[in-house]
Amino acid sequence: KILLDLINDEIERSNIDRNEVYIAKSKSNTLREIDASQFLEEQGMIIVETDLGDRILQLKKDDNSPVHPTGPASHLTVHDIAEIVNESMNLDLPVEPRPIMEAVREDVLGLIEKSSIGISGTNSIAAEDGAVLMVHNEGNISLVQSKKLHIIVAGIDKLVPLLEDCVSIGKLETAFATGKPLTSYINIVAGPSKTADIEKKLLKNMYGAEKVAVILLDNGRKDAIKECLWCIGCGNCVVNCPVYNVVGNEFGYHSYLGGRGVALSKYLKDNKGSVDSGLYMCTLCGMCTENCPVLTPTNKIIEDLRNTAQKDGLSKDQHKKIRDNIKEKGSPY
């Protein structure tokens, strides 16, 4: 509701035709968590994904769930992507990455020219400094945050004390997600654009956003065990997960993939949500923890959640049968 109220205020303030409300959006697992795009589209708004991977999935329309936090379309081949782009944009591009990238870029730039609203997530928020930090390679977030209204939606788990902490998290995520020490861009936003170049008088609304709004999302996080909120979103756990590499994004919850997504779903939804997300798929091998930059004990969390699920009667039918056989026959068979 807060998100919609902010957008409606901007529509009225800028006298935007309600039949042509374009919103420039960057990649955000938090926005996926609350189905922000679907919700806004149901209000008649046109969402334009600016991240290349997200835009490809948006054009795909069906069976378009992301498979990695930083590489949402990494499961698609260049042949798949060429077919998606050619069909959705009525083009005849060759099966080559560069012409596909250029076609999507020109299409996105043309659409977001019509927008005065940008929405994004963030990598971290410096509570004491009053600033948010975003890391990206494509430069698309710079376009999103230059709109008249820039709305940032973030879970309360993104809060850290200082800007220095934000930078450390951004560097750590980049290293474990891409193997590089830094992304191409690190954006820090601490308010609307402004200048003091004329007699040192502070004037707002120069080139960037005229208004910046930050929405902090709880959605069950306050009740979660603290280890569930350590995640920095690098995706290294799913790359090294034997289960995820077999079943894909069926193992996880919404945009939170793998065992960590299963664990978090207990608090974002409920015990049954964690079972439906793959609570019993996990092998408890611990590869996720071993490859996690912050050593989130995901396998231990899942083991504890299984105990809770068992107490609530949320066992798999096969497990119930084994248990009953042991009780009645003294054997699982």
Residue ranges of each PLM-predicted region?
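The feature marks the mature, well-folded catalytic cores of soluble enzymes
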Residues: 1-223
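Phosphate-binding glycine-rich loops and their immediate beta-loop-alpha structural context
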Residues: 231
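Flexible, glycine/charged-enriched surface loops at secondary-structure junctions
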Residues: 1, 17, 176-186, 241-253, ...
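Residues at the N-terminus of the alpha-helix immediately C-terminal to the conserved SAM/SAH-binding loop
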Residues: 32-33, 237, 288
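Generic, well-ordered alpha-helical scaffold segments in large soluble proteins
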Residues: 6, 10, 39, 43, ...
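Ferredoxin-type iron-sulfur electron-transfer modules in oxidoreductases and energy-metabolism complexes
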Residues: 204-228, 244-331
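Conserved hydrophobic/aromatic pocket- or pore-lining residues that grip, position, or stack substrates
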Residues: 130, 241, 333
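Catalytic adenosine-cofactor/nucleotide-binding cores of aminoacyl-tRNA synthetases and other
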Residues: 234
